[in-house]
Amino acid sequence: MPRRAREYPEEGEFVVATVKRIHNYGAFLELDEYPGKEAFMHISEVASTWVRNIRDYLKEGQKVVAKVIRVDPRKGHIDLSLRRVTQQQRKAKLQEFKRAQKAENLLKLAAEKLGKDFETAWREVWVPLEEEWGEVYAAFEDAAKDGIDVLKGHVPDEWLPVLKEIIDNYVEVPTVTIDAEFEITVPKPNGVEIIKEALIRARDRANKEKDVEVKFTYLGAPRYRIDITAPDYYKAEEVLESIAEEILRVIKEAGGEATLLRKEKRIKKVKKRKK
């Protein structure tokens, strides 16, 4: 079970918790990411509506995503709320928790290869990476994208070769793909060749960018579709703007016309394994 580097959660933090004991006035839950820490959820924080029977909402052994509303480390008190968690926040926290589980499994594999126990791995690798990146899997993703040297100085050097091997094999580089369409016309006998040359030049220029891939698809005159895959949305938009400027310039100089068309809800996130 992945655990956080901090001893106590912070107010406003979302946590994964397991219901341990239920009473008429509330429930006690164990914090999965904070071993040995127990929290209390008052019945008024279980649901937005009036709760007649708390057991209609909570069961022993049930895992929930809750929001930390009060923390008193001196007394060891932690208060949680279920009603203050939206569906979107719950989904995001569960995704984060799954990423932490994956990071933990990969670190266990690395520790095994080095002949170290997980407590040592947690202390030497997990804690410094979480403190620097916020979550360990994000550090692994950066290493997959930019090279293992991004971890240098944060973890002991002896970990780097084995972490590189594991990250290369198991960690996918997150990417974003956006698409758009161009309407291009060049009223000349060689208009098709001019358009083709403009698209090829724009594509090849963009593909020189690190971790960027551009693809054109002919949809039928005068429409052409462009797909841009990049490390993040902002980079993809930057590349699209650059390509559009290049195509519009070349086509205009050739006496033609080019228009960039954007469609709503055509942005999607994908994952591409690092080659």
From Swiss-Prot:
HAMAP family for this protein: eIF_2_alpha (MF_00231)
Function recorded in the entry: eIF-2 functions in the early steps of protein synthesis by forming a ternary complex with GTP and initiator tRNA.
Give the species.
Pyrococcus abyssi (strain GE5 / Orsay)
* NADP is among the record's keywords: no
Looking up CDD domains in the UniProt record yields: S1_IF2_alpha
Instruction: Name the SUPFAM superfamilies for this protein.
Output: eIF-2-alpha, C-terminal domain, eIF2alpha middle domain-like, Nucleic acid-binding proteins
Protein name, entry field: Translation initiation factor 2 subunit alpha
Note the subunit structure: Heterotrimer composed of an alpha, a beta and a gamma chain.
- Specify the domain of life of the species encoding this protein: Archaea
In the record, the note on similarity to other proteins reads:
Belongs to the eIF-2-alpha family.
- An example of a Pfam family matching this protein is EIF_2_alpha
Q: What is the lineage of its organism?
A: Archaea, Methanobacteriati, Methanobacteriota, Thermococci, Thermococcales
Gene designation: eif2a
GO MF annotations for this entry?
ribosome binding; RNA binding; translation initiation factor activity
List the PANTHER family hit by this protein, alphabetically: EUKARYOTIC TRANSLATION INITIATION FACTOR 2 SUBUNIT 1 (PTHR10602:SF0)
Positions of the S1 motif domain: 12-83
Q: Keywords on this record?
A: Initiation factor, Protein biosynthesis, RNA-binding
